[in-house]
Amino acid sequence: MSATATGPRIIARQRPSSEAADARPSLLGRLAPGAVEAASGVLVALGFTWICTFIKVNPMQRVGQVSGLAALQLRFILAFVVLALLWWAASRWFSRPLALRTAAASLSGLATGLYAGGVAVALRGTVWPLNAKRGDSGQLQQWTGDILEGRPISSVYPPLFPHLLARWTDLLYPGQPGLGLKMLGLVLIALTGPAVYLAWRLLLPPLWALAIGVVPVFPIVHAAKPYVDVVLLVLIPVLARFTTSLLRSTGKSVRTALFTGAAYGLALALLFLWYSGWFVWSAPGMLAVMVVTLAKVRRRGKDAVLRAAALLGATAAVFLLVAGVYLQRLLAGSDTPDTYMYFDTNVDPAYFAMWQGDSPGVIANGAWPLPGELGGVGVFVLLLIVGVGAALWLGAALPVVQVAAFCMLGAFLMRYWFASHMERDQLVQLYPRTSAELLYCGIVLFGMACYLLSRKFATREGTGTAESSGRAVATPALRTGGAVLCALAFFFSMAGSSTVDRFMPANQGSWGSFAWFAHTTPLPDGKCPKFAPEGKCG
């Protein structure tokens, strides 16, 4: 991935000259490429998911599951070949930067389209979502009915998704909240890739946004509750971009700072109303980031402080205007005890690489976590540790590195605080959920270390390439982009297949049990799902 790839940089940009400013494209010219980029990711994600719904297998039999996984891979490869050919043609005869952006966005959609398509295969023959009417799935279906009939729901649960589900069900699947949740879940899984990719495009060039943003989707996003994890994946880059805007507010007018802050306030409020849990775990880290950032701004003088205060104040005002009522209810209910003990509460709290939740499957009968090679630490975690160190070495001053590092530290502190008091208080307080944030921040820092190293290498090689002809420079860039896209597609195909396989129906207390319950729960009309074992359910 060449550090010179097209896209926004995370380093401070030089202010353009008046001649360059006059030559800027129109507003439509600036927005159109981004719109094409976003649309390509969304269309590929939804289109590939739809194609996968035509895979005809019995997901309750292992041979059917294997055939389904193979059919998914076959479609993925064919779709990627088509996308690669379109990218190559567009790069040769149209705009290479736009072609790269479109290809990266399309691959982000293809990656999570594979995930969503696999879940669709696992749920073939039943109207129920993962976990049927159990747990959170059943609660959301109950709330759907409550909302449509004008009854109140939980005052502390984030309200945006339940209300969206209710409107979605009422519009498309009236009287069938289970089917509505199933279909909306598939759409959300499919759109997770493009959403995360576009969030990281606020900071990074296309290929790096694709790698750092979409790779963590597979180990973090749980198909039974995709609406939860997507907020975490989007929140970190948005917070990093917000921090960057605070630092750059010096060169803006007060009016621009106010409008920018209002936009951030609205975005953060919507994420908060969608799922607030990640704001809680990220709060200590972001408080530290704000202290460091505002200290930098203060050293730039009163003018910088004024504009930063305008941006920060507008952000807070709009956030409170949109989400203030829910925030007040959440704070009022913050003393609600969580006593639910499950598998991960008995695991070494220093381990975060894989979160099993309350569905460990056969792992519950063996040693977990698996013993690592170096002092009990495995190779994967060692790579994350090296990445954290390298990112801090090369980019400690960068907002994205600071946000990821401080949020990781803050999540660790809260995790250890609650775990250390668990015996005394007999409370869990959801601390194992910090595993996802710790893993995500570790992957982000590893990815940023690779990005910064590539930039450092590209800078050293810059003199030689600058003296080369345009054609000599362009050919390796095209080859490099193709190589990276192929490598990432290979990873997405393998990770997607493995993740989907974990959700294939299995009555083993594993993640496969979510689909198993969907196939063994009677349908609303009292009949059994098509592939219920021996036609029996209940």
Model-derived segments and their meaning:
Residues 136, 227, 277-283, 287, ...:
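Transmembrane catalytic cores of multi-pass membrane glycosyltransferases
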Residues 101-155, 316-350, 498-514:
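Aromatic-rich transmembrane-lumenal/periplasmic boundary elements in polytopic membrane proteins
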Residues 1-122:
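Start-transfer (signal-anchor) and selected internal transmembrane alpha helices
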Residues 375-401:
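Hydrophobic, aromatic-rich transmembrane alpha-helices
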